[in-house]
């Protein structure tokens, strides 16, 4: 997409250099009842439901719902101190927890984001996510109130 206003060609070139985010991988929803939520997506919406996966490093049990163009990830607390437990304490009915984008190079993405003032949560080092690939989370206050997860593909 070329922008005609304010020197469109130069702006287009700059946007190409800065391009980092790939496709939307999934939207994650924290739920108070994992089995009921999965059944609702399967029965009511006819979606294909994956098996529950425990992710102890992240304090969650997840179920992926396959859609034609992306996925929904249902999140349920696993163990003491789960971030989903505290999310559900504030949002007892559940709700959107984060949006997940793919990136080609997680370390380059982190460097570019941090150079622009974005905050990486946790230690700042990638962890292995539910797909077996490195992931990072970005502070929601830096992204219009939305927690962002990035995964290297």
What is each stretch, according to the model?
Residues 68-72, 79-81, 106:
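Short, charged/polar surface micro-motifs in flexible loops or helix N-caps
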Residues 50, 81-86, 122:
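A short, acidic/glycine-rich surface segment
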Residues 17-18, 86-92:
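Short, flexible, solvent-exposed loop/turn segments with mixed acidic/basic and small polar residues
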Residues 18-58:
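Long, hydrophobic N-terminal alpha-helical segment
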Residues 24, 31, 41, 65, ...:
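Short, structured motif recognition centered on aromatic/hydrophobic residues
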Residues 4-6, 17-19, 31-39, 53, 63-66, 79, 91-141, ...:
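Vicinal oxygen chelate
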């Amino acid at each position: 997409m070329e922008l005609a206003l304010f020197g469109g060609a130069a702006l287009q070139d700059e946007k190409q250099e800065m391009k980092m985010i790939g496709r939307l991988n999934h939207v994650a929803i924290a739920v108070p009842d994992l089995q009921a939520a999965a059944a609702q997506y399967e029965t009511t919406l006819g979606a294909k439901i994956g098996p529950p996966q425990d992710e102890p490093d992240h304090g969650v049990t997840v179920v992926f719902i396959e859609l034609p163009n992306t996925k929904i990830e249902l999140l349920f607390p696993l163990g003491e101190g789960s971030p989903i437990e505290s999310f559900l304490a504030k949002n007892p009915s559940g709700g959107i927890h984060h949006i997940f984008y793919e990136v080609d190079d997680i370390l380059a993405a982190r460097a570019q984001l941090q150079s622009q003032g974005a905050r990486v949560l946790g230690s700042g080092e990638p962890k292995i996510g539910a797909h077996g690939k490195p992931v990072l989370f970005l502070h929601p206050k830096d992204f219009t109130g939305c927690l962002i997860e990035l995964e290297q593909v």
